Amino acid sequence: MTHIRKSHPLLKILNKSFIDLPTPSNISTWWNFGSLLGACLITQILTGLFLAMHYTPDTMTAFSSMSHICRDVNYGWIIRQLHSNGASIFFLCLYTHIGRNIYYGSYLYSETWNTGIMLLLITMATAFMGYVLPWGQMSFWGATVITNLFSAIPYIGTDLVEWIWGGFSVDKATLNRFFALHFILPFTMIALAGVHLTFLHETGSNNPLGLTSDSDKIPFHPYYTIKDFLGLLILILFLLLLALLSPDMLGDPDNYMPADPLNTPLHIKPEWYFLFAYAILRSVPNKLGGVLALLLSILILGIMPLLHTSKHRSMMLRPLSQVLFWTLATDLLMLTWIGSQPVEYPYIIIGQMASILYFSIILAFLPIAGMIENYLIK
């Protein structure tokens, strides 16, 4: 008799995706981050749902409603800290996941890669709108500065910014629509993650060697479900340590002051996970040029499959490409640091050099390294 998980219409889909899925036998811990991202998304949706029950998207009461959640709502403080620090863990997993895909050449699965880039963009938009909701100083000024970037678009820029704001400045209408979008976008992310997984299961997972593994596959359950569960436990431990012992470590002290349109903070900056892109934006003196550089810093990932020149898929056996990859990772850390610093010498010149290096590695150095490695293995 056929097991119900193989015959039931719904369970059959889950079985093919998470139980009997043929998986390469040699995938490492770096392959855990996909499932961790799914766990992060579910955690964010659940904690966000409980926060939304007590939050009021109104400029007069938004800040005090956050205070009310932390002081008066049962376990409201831990729900808020899990949600805000959960976003940081989410982006940490996200960037690690992207880094692993670049290192092991998984971007050659172009459909999976492109849906992943779409997920990244939606996640960034969702996180930005979420940062505005507490209506603190950095929330208000961050929203003002970032939405103002749209005014750099020729002809329609000013009208577009006022359309986004719902008025002539960031105000009640802006907060209201940001709350609505922040609430709905994670559900579109779930749908897109389903598409992402569907494309991945069409091709099967890549592996550290970058070779075809059709002759050496094992079922996903129990081998990788146990492995993913261990990763999940470590993630939960890390999140709880962060939320309980140092909840404000990654936040900005300015956000504990209510939004004041008449008082500009000394140094406006976004959350740490956007600092690399913010540093690239600031490194270009021209406004439109900066906005284009900001966009390209993310969209450049989309052309990576076209820039792959090596005969080897993975970087595991390509020492020259490995050096460039870790240089890129270090460069991103440097950009993150620069984004948190004031706009003055020597930070300006360091930011410009780091931005040039970022684009140079992806557009020129990695493809050239691939060609050199091809020549060396002849």
Swiss-Prot record:
Gene3D superfamilies: Cytochrome Bc1 Complex, Chain C. It comes from the Eukaryota. One of its GO terms (cellular component) is mitochondrial inner membrane. Keywords: Electron transport, Extinct organism protein, Heme, Iron, Membrane, Metal-binding, Mitochondrion, Mitochondrion inner membrane, Respiratory chain, Transmembrane, Transmembrane helix, Transport, Ubiquinone. It is found in: Mitochondrion inner membrane. It holds the Pfam family Cytochrome_B. GO terms for biological process: mitochondrial electron transport, ubiquinol to cytochrome c. Heme b b566 binds at H97, H196. InterPro entries: Cyt_b/b6_C (IPR005798), Cyt_b/b6_C_sf (IPR036150), Cyt_b/b6_N (IPR005797), Cytb/b6-like_sf (IPR027387), Cytochrome_b (IPR030689), Cytochrome_b_C_euk/bac (IPR048260), Cytochrome_b_N_euk/bac (IPR048259), Di-haem_cyt_TM (IPR016174). The keyword Electron transport applies. A ubiquinone binds at H201. Heme 1 (or BL or b562) is low-potential and absorbs at about 562 nm, and heme 2 (or BH or b566) is high-potential and absorbs at about 566 nm. The cytochrome bc1 complex contains 11 subunits: 3 respiratory subunits (MT-CYB, CYC1 and UQCRFS1), 2 core proteins (UQCRC1 and UQCRC2) and 6 low-molecular weight proteins (UQCRH/QCR6, UQCRB/QCR7, UQCRQ/QCR8, UQCR10/QCR9, UQCR11/QCR10 and a cleavage product of UQCRFS1). This cytochrome bc1 complex then forms a dimer. This is Cytochrome b. The gene is MT-CYB.
